[in-house]
């Protein structure tokens, strides 16, 4: 298989951008920008999220068994870039972002249009990113979208011509 063709083809898959947050008992909250996300079931409502195994949010989610998927909206490129690096909790803010706490104990970004609380039901431990299969246990709408909900989501391509993840 041609390496460049593989990258090109896989980069044609569109992705939204999300900040996944989790907090394991006795640890600081962790957060990371993620984009390999999809809904996989209506009943029960399930999501699948690919997460890099050496990330803090991976460790916190695996230890706690739950997380929040904060859905970034149009214009939130700054938040996406912020959580490309490890998060820090300072003065009640997570890497400068105001937060509140979900019922499952993970942080919710107040600036995110929506956040989804999830309970991990399975971890597929294959590849350099493991896949969390998780049931949606709660939702928080901070800003109702005008028009189609899927058009309100920040997409990878909106981070610039040279920003890719995948391939």
Could you tell me what each predicted segment is?
Residues 1-167:
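Basic, polyanion-binding surface patches
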